[in-house]
Amino acid sequence: GRSPEGAVRAPGRVNLIGEHTDYNDGFVLPIAIERETVALFARRDDGIVNLASTLSDETASVDLAAPIVKAAPAWADYCRGVLAGLQAAGIELSGMDIYFDSTVPLGGGLSSSASLEVATGLAMMGGESSLDDLTLAKICQKAEHDFAGTPCGIMDQSISVMGQAGKALLMDCQSGETQQIPFNDPKLVLLVADTKVKHELNDGGYAARRDQCYAAAKILGAPMLRDTDAATLEAKRDALSDVEFRRARHVLGEIKRTLDAVAALGADDYHTFGELMVASHVSLRDDYNVSCDELDAIVDLAC
């Protein structure tokens, strides 16, 4: 029943190319979309943060003076994690009423959770971040690790914080360096298709693939897969299981495809860019086993 003091927005995203490379210290090329999470906020003077959403009948209250832990409802754990992270970063927080509305489809692969986390962080800081972009993204990433149980990479939170209209974001997930890549040619249309197949990042499949990549890197004598190459992978093929080999082959190939895609965009070579996107899908389907019949059909139709 209160009037908001302000509002913040955090967009969802699609990843043009660079799939499952972020947690392997590779390169990614996401772009923000118009679907977004909006948070209306109003300060309180009692140290209580009240969380409500148009997408849930369940609300949550968090006492900033008490230890912040996971609790029901589950959707609010993403917010609780951000509150805990901001406190740990030394940000002085006040009580707040926050009301969320989101047009990012849940479980559709458009980073609804990251946009919720970023919107929470921005709202808690009164609409103006006192942190640099990467630090805020890392706080939101840690929230997802610790409070949602998903060992995600840094990409989703980063593009939600740093996304700009008409530009994709090339991110080096090892150094944290970013570059805005123009993606606004009027001849270009980015079609985002919904397969209607839902996913859960915390269902175990994501974590299993991450672990397989880390195991492969260890066998290859590298801190992360980013730090090795295709020749080393082939030379040590017999030391890896078939699954580990295929996971590593995807990651190394995807890192190269991502850099090649940026070069293609810079040359306005959209045909090559499209070929690289298709090659990425084939690798995700065959080596990473993360596609589905519906997605395969959409790619086949597009080609």
Which residue stretches match the model-derived regions?
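C-terminal nucleotide
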Residues: 2-13, 38-72, 167-303
